[in-house]
Amino acid sequence: MNPASVPPALPPPGQQVIHVTQDLDTDLEALFNSVMNPKPSSWRKKILPESFFKEPDSGSHSRQSSTDSSGGHAGPRLAGGAQHVRSHSSPASLQLGPGAGAAGSPAQQHAHLRQQSYDVTDELPLPPGWEMTFTATGQRYFLNHIEKITTWQDPRKAMNQSLNPMNLHPAATSTPASQRSMAVSQPNLVMNHQHQQQMAPTNLSQQNHPTQNPPAGLMSMPNALTTQQQQQQKLRLQRIQMERERIRMRQEELMRQEAALCRQLPMEAETLATVQAAVNPPAMTPDMRSITNNSSDPFLNGGPYHSREQSTDSGLGLGCYSVPTTPEDFLSNVDEMDTGENAGQTPMNINPQQTRFPDFLDCLPGTNVDLGTLESEDLIPLFNDVESALNKSEPFLTWL
């Protein structure tokens, strides 16, 4: 009995058994040969469906013989009436060929509804430079020979939108997007069209569709567009004229308001100029200067403006003092005491509103008169003048 044919005994649970093969080199060589030099196996030994080993009956499943992509030529069909699935994913399924329209089923006739919704624009002629052609599957597209573009969109729809008064600016930005979408969906068609433009323009006249030839009404489209442009220019001109009229009326209204404000001012223009030259405040308007220099009540003048009036019942205002009561001989004594070079120019440079208030205080300590330089006989008339100013019956200061 060959010990190699005896099956090895199962090891007890929990124990591992190590087998040592005698011909290890032979087994490794067989493994390398099976990997490096594989032998071809039969297709029958592989798990494949039964339809894989059957030859096709005909070529009806090819792309060229499908119903909606044959371009109107009757191709062979299957007994079950199955159509190619690839053709339904393309835009060619939206419109059938000329030869398949009569014998189409109700489901195929329903696919024509999307095309018939745009039949209103078929009566209008194409714009200048445009041409409508059809693909091999019956899908129509439009060529612009002026701008060298190809699009699925009908340019007559954009022209109808431009003729509408509410839509003066048609959506022309959809042309590049539609051109890109057409180039992505059917690149062979775009390349074929570019090749036809480079080779010979006479190939465009070989199409058998009746709308390729420009109709007689195509020559009237520039006149219609010119009329529409004239209407737009008239509307724009009317808007400009209305705006100019509103500006003119506004200017007249401003002039009337200015004249009314000038009539409401209580003082004349010459008086205002004189006061402005004398006072010359940097940030006062004419109406504020008139109220400031006028001693009457500003509300009696009838002016529409209200400003801050000067105080007439306190010592803080500028108009609360009376006529200066300094005697003439006192002023002459002051002129004799001033021995500076610019003594005569000092009263001219000082603001009159600042020198009129402290008239009798010039002889007191802390003023511009030095009492140490005066003699005793000179001080007596000064004190008398101060007493006469303080003992007046009509006081010029009102204490609150």
Swiss-Prot record:
In the record, which positions carry Phosphoserine?
Answer: S62, S89, S295, S311
* Glycyl lysine isopeptide (Lys-Gly) (interchain with G-Cter in ubiquitin) cross-link site: K46
The subcellular localization recorded is:
Cytoplasm; Nucleus; Cell membrane; Cell junction, Tight junction
Region Required for interaction with PALS1: list its residue ranges: 222-400
Name the UniProt key words of this record, in alphabetical order.
Answer: Activator, Cell junction, Cell membrane, Cytoplasm, Isopeptide bond, Membrane, Nucleus, Phosphoprotein, Tight junction, Ubl conjugation
Query: Could you tell me where the Low complexity compositional bias lies?
Result: 91-110
Maturation and modification: Phosphorylated by LATS2 and STK3/MST2. Phosphorylation by LATS2 results in creation of 14-3-3 binding sites, retention in the cytoplasm, and functional inactivation. Phosphorylation results in the inhibition of transcriptional coactivation through YWHAZ-mediated nuclear export.
How is the quaternary structure described? Binds to SLC9A3R2 via the PDZ motif at the plasma membrane. Binds to YWHAZ in vivo and in vitro through the phosphoserine-binding motif RSHSSP. Interacts (via coiled-coil domain) with SMAD2 (via MH1 domain), SMAD3 and SMAD4. Interacts with MED15. Interacts with PAX8 and NKX2-1. Interacts with TEAD1, TEAD2, TEAD3 and TEAD4. Interacts (via WW domain) with PALS1. Interacts with LATS1. Interacts with YAP1 (when phosphorylated at 'Ser-112'). Interacts (via WW domain) with PRRG4 (via cytoplasmic domain).
Function, as annotated: Transcriptional coactivator which acts as a downstream regulatory target in the Hippo signaling pathway that plays a pivotal role in organ size control and tumor suppression by restricting proliferation and promoting apoptosis. The core of this pathway is composed of a kinase cascade wherein STK3/MST2 and STK4/MST1, in complex with its regulatory protein SAV1, phosphorylates and activates LATS1/2 in complex with its regulatory protein MOB1, which in turn phosphorylates and inactivates YAP1 oncoprotein and WWTR1/TAZ. WWTR1 enhances PAX8 and NKX2-1/TTF1-dependent gene activation.
Q: What is this protein called?
A: WW domain-containing transcription regulator protein 1
**Organism annotation:** Canis lupus familiaris (Dog)
Name the encoding gene, please.
WWTR1
